[in-house]
Amino acid sequence: MGELCRRDSALTALDEETLWEMMESHRHRIVRCICPSRLTPYLRQAKVLCQLDEEEVLHSPRLTNSAMRAGHLLDLLKTRGKNGAIAFLESLKFHNPDVYTLVTGLQPDVDFSNFSGLMETSKLTECLAGAIGSLQEELNQEKGQKEVLLRRCQQLQEHLGLAETRAEGLHQLEADHSRMKREVSAHFHEVLRLKDEMLSLSLHYSNALQEKELAASRCRSLQEELYLLKQELQRANMVSSCELELQEQSLRTASDQESGDEELNRLKEENEKLRSLTFSLAEKDILEQSLDEARGSRQELVERIHSLRERAVAAERQREQYWEEKEQTLLQFQKSKMACQLYREKVNALQAQVCELQKERDQAYSARDSAQREISQSLVEKDSLRRQVFELTDQVCELRTQLRQLQAEPPGVLKQEARTREPCPREKQRLVRMHAICPRDDSDCSLVSSTESQLLSDLSATSSRELVDSFRSSSPAPPSQQSLYKRVAEDFGEEPWSFSSCLEIPEGDPGALPGAKAGDPHLDYELLDTADLPQLESSLQPVSPGRLDVSESGVLMRRRPARRILSQVTMLAFQGDALLEQISVIGGNLTGIFIHRVTPGSAADQMALRPGTQIVMVDYEASEPLFKAVLEDTTLEEAVGLLRRVDGFCCLSVKVNTDGYKRLLQDLEAKVATSGDSFYIRVNLAMEGRAKGELQVHCNEVLHVTDTMFQGCGCWHAHRVNSYTMKDTAAHGTIPNYSRAQQQLIALIQDMTQQCTVTRKPSSGGPQKLVRIVSMDKAKASPLRLSFDRGQLDPSRMEGSSTCFWAESCLTLVPYTLVRPHRPARPRPVLLVPRAVGKILSEKLCLLQGFKKCLAEYLSQEEYEAWSQRGDIIQEGEVSGGRCWVTRHAVESLMEKNTHALLDVQLDSVCTLHRMDIFPIVIHVSVNEKMAKKLKKGLQRLGTSEEQLLEAARQEEGDLDRAPCLYSSLAPDGWSDLDGLLSCVRQAIADEQKKVVWTEQSPR
């Protein structure tokens, strides 16, 4: 055989004899392996065979098998010489590569572009050659697949055999089960038969007792007869002895008598008389035989008496058992009767309460109707007052125009008009009002001229003070001037809210006002021109206490310097057109909202708003929609959204908080924080975080949000929180804000719904949870609020709660839930879900140290009312008879003993426990059909089927989403039997005890 390294061209270099010697040496193998019908098409194209030769090889009747046809083909090719050998080898290369390698020692490497010179090369030939190669590869692949399928078939056959064996075992078990059922039924019938026999034996026993009494009476009569017979026998013996003695005596005395025959006859007669007196021997034998029979019957009666006594003892024992059962049945009957009576009393009490509630409901309906009527009347009055305010505002604008015209006249004319007491309109003054130190010390005050007093008193009648005070008015009727002045004076001393001197209200000296005294210290004002405002900030020149001078520029100077009390909240009313273009804010819910920059020349700048001023509340009622919001504990995003809506006349309640502003700036410069926001949320959906910088979040994960305006709007910056230490981890990034997250939640729910409609699979024990369905009640305040829907706002509602960061909208799905941490020191109670699995596990856990069932307590009606009023009732216990409740005292007593209380309550009781500052550990055991079969024995003890367990598990899984806390879930593939599940539950309880407890923070 040639070497493997030789090329195909070496075959053409060989001579004819060498080639045919190679093939003849392997002729036997070639003839057995090749199929002539596959080789002849190629040989015909190579022109070494003609059509007649092909028909002769394939259809000659002399060639009866394939070996003969292959041999004849070789003989024909041998006549063709070298070309026949080369063409045959090339055909073997395509159709029998292993034979080609055996003959030539070369690998069958097919080069489609290099055929031998025996046939014309064309694209069709190359294509056919390629097709042959691909078909050979497919054939090899199919052979491999066939082998794999054969092995798979063998494995399946083995599995089938095992399954058949298992089925036979199951059939055997079923047969045994049916046999045991039949045996149990037979035993049951046997027990019934034995009971019947026992009853019949008791009847026989009573009959035997009667027979015993009869036999005893008969025995006594026989004994009496025997006694009489004995007495008669003794009497006869005595008579016979006496007769013998008399006979002997008579014989001795009559021995000498001669007449012995006569004596003998006499004795015989006497003997016959005696025999007549005594019994005959036959009668005696009869009496002895009857006596023996009586003794035998007596022995039988004694034995029967003993057996009847034993039966009597057994019957007495059974009678005592039946008596005890009767006593227990009577006791249960009494308990049931008492429970029925208590239930009847409870139903009567509930019916009475329902009647009272119906009465209260009717009263509430009537009160609601009256309140609605009052509200509608108040709204009508408010609308009329608002129209009056608009009319007065127009009058104020006209008066301001007149003041500017009068101000343009020379000062001499102004003084002359002042002497003649004519009204002198001046340019709009800025009223500066501040709290003074020791205001009572300045007792003297000079009055301005009567001309200015008359002017300012006329202006006060139509001044915009009514517009400003209308914000404070609690009554729909407009207040009088004196009440307004009195209210202004009382604001300084009593209320924490004080009006600033920056209100745009032209006022004169309070001494000219009706009802005001010249020395009233509460009305220290300083009328300044707009041009003199910068000088006011640098210095305040006091005037003499005797009089109040008016400078040439028309500035009414203050009597003495004053200082502002920084802790007071000041209300500023001004024209806030596009308020966020006038000011920029920083801060958040942790630090408060501060003014950071003020646009020079804006209305906010004219109102002396400066960086570092904290905004407490915004009141925007000048136009629709109306709102009033507290900004002390709101996030930066919400504050920006609120202030962006302000576009017109508004009121800002502000206070100076320099220390807080400086600390915030230091944290921002040191990059300790990016804003003043800080709160914790629970994420109710899974987010992948595909973009760069986004945080990948799982459902039910707790995050610490530190910035709600991170890199602009639309996203928050959050840190993942350590479950054990509550510290921020290194994993941080951006998450969508509330509105975007809500859209993602809706889209995710829609996708899941479409997938469920296509392939319905049970969710229990499936992959990781993607969505937690949490909805909020629109009647309550949202737990977190980000922005406001203009179409949904109520004008009369006060917006802004310390925990309200979320948006109001028509959608009630909650993507984020505001949570707060707790660290309980004592062992927490344990609540297992589903409840059926919890009951099975509680029986095992209560046997271990550190676990104990929390039993329901029996409470009387008075105790129940007292405990319920204190809020110490958790849930009614599942005990027959009622009035058994799971109480706070029972749970806390176990917690004080350093023991985990095993609770058997519903999931809605978790909210009740949280109100008691008790935070249970909720363990959810995922159950599917396979796992339910492993709990079959425990379910049978509870009287529950597998289908009922699966249905209850599906219902309670839905209730888990509404629970106000996190829970630990155990996958069904994490345990194989009840002991494995018990160890998993213990490990989960120990792990949850170490973690921080996160509960939902309800709105205040």
UniProtKB/Swiss-Prot annotation:
Tissue specificity note: Isoform 1 is detected in placenta and epidermal keratinocytes. Isoform 2 is detected in leukocytes and fetal brain.
Gene Ontology cellular-component annotations: aggresome; cytoplasm; cytosol; plasma membrane
Residue ranges of the region described as Maintains the protein in an inactive state: 409-568
Effect of residue 338 to V: Does not change NF-kappaB transcription factor activity
UniProt xrefs under InterPro entries: CARD, DEATH-like_dom_sf, Guanylate_kin-like_dom, P-loop_NTPase, PDZ, PDZ_sf
Domain Guanylate kinase-like, residue spans: 807-990
Outcome following mutation: residue 197 to K: In PSORS2; increases NF-kappaB transcription factor activity
Record carries keyword Ribonucleoprotein: no
Keyword annotations: Apoptosis, Coiled coil, Cytoplasm, Disease variant, Phosphoprotein
Free-text function comment from the UniProt entry: Acts as a scaffolding protein that can activate the inflammatory transcription factor NF-kappa-B and p38/JNK MAP kinase signaling pathways. Forms a signaling complex with BCL10 and MALT1, and activates MALT1 proteolytic activity and inflammatory gene expression. MALT1 is indispensable for CARD14-induced activation of NF-kappa-B and p38/JNK MAP kinases. May play a role in signaling mediated by TRAF2, TRAF3 and TRAF6 and protects cells against apoptosis.
Comment text on domains: A linker region between the coiled-coil and PDZ region holds the protein in an inactive state.
Disease the record associates with this protein: Psoriasis 2: A common, chronic inflammatory disease of the skin with multifactorial etiology. It is characterized by red, scaly plaques usually found on the scalp, elbows and knees. These lesions are caused by abnormal keratinocyte proliferation and infiltration of inflammatory cells into the dermis and epidermis.
Name of the featured protein: Caspase recruitment domain-containing protein 14
Origin species: Homo sapiens
Lineage: Eukaryota, Metazoa, Chordata, Craniata, Vertebrata
